[in-house]
């Protein structure tokens, strides 16, 4: 993936493989270095630093650390007040910081992961379904943070508001084919050209899987 223009910074990846969402998750795992591609290659720019929000964060919280201790390990600044400031942006207040990460709810774990992204200082953020388990207040806080983020965002989300207000480039995976368009989400959905491409890719795959009688 190569973003040529500095203005093309927020990309949303939309998966149309149906109930199998593995395709986009595999793409994120490849881009984050967690998985090697079967073929092809990609290269990050020399000045980029990346941070990844996985769809499954279970392994991240298999410890007895408190929230503050857990986040401090990812912070370039180890001052507790500094770390608590990032937690506060994701609606963790006061005594929340001494909770053990092992017992956090799904929504609290997501907010911890988002705090980790922010505190990392990375200029490329990759987020795979970041709104899962979040309530409306947390989704609004996330949306505001993504809008203000000055770097590159590559994300997937089912939340229409976040995609519409944040993304200026839509990449859609249709049965293994990639549609790539610099546009807002609503314009993408209303585009006859994009609808034709989705139809052509879907029909092509249907013919590919057609078995003739012998």
For each predicted feature, which ranges?
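Single conserved hydrophobic/aromatic residue that forms the stacking wall/gate
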Residues: 1-9, 13-15, 207-214
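ABC ATPase nucleotide-binding domain signature region
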Residues: 13, 19, 23-79, 109-112, 139, 167, ...
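H-loop/switch region of ABC-family ATPase nucleotide-binding domains
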Residues: 157-158
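Charged, heptad-repeat coiled-coil alpha-helices that serve as long linker/dimerization "arms"
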Residues: 190-210
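ABC-family P-loop ATPase nucleotide-binding domains
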Residues: 54-129
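Walker B catalytic motif
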Residues: 129-130, 135-137
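A short, surface-exposed alpha-helical micro-motif characterized by mixed small hydrophobic
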Residues: 163-165
């Amino acid at each position: 993936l190569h973003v040529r223009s500095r203005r093309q910074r927020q990309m949303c990846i939309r998966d149309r493989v149906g109930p199998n969402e593995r395709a986009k998750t595999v793409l994120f795992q490849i881009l984050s270095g967690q998985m090697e591609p079967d073929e092809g290659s990609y290269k990050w720019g020399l000045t980029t630093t990346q941070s990844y929000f996985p769809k499954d964060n279970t392994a991240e919280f298999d410890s007895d650390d408190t929230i503050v201790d857990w986040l401090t390990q990812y912070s370039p600044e180890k001052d507790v007040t500094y770390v608590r400031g990032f937690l506060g942006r994701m609606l963790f207040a006061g005594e929340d910081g001494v909770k053990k990460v092992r017992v956090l709810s799904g929504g609290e774990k997501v907010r911890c992961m988002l705090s980790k992204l922010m505190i990392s200082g990375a200029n490329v953020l990759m987020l795979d379904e970041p709104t899962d388990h979040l309530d409306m207040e947390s989704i609004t806080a996330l949306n505001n943070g993504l809008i203000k983020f000055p770097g590159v965002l590559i994300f997937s989300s089912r939340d229409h508001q976040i995609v519409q207000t944040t993304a200026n480039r839509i990449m859609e995976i249709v049965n293994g084919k990639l549609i790539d368009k610099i546009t807002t989400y609503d314009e993408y959905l209303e585009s006859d050209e994009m609808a034709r491409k989705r139809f052509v890719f879907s029909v092509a795959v249907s013919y590919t899987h057609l078995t003739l009688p012998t």
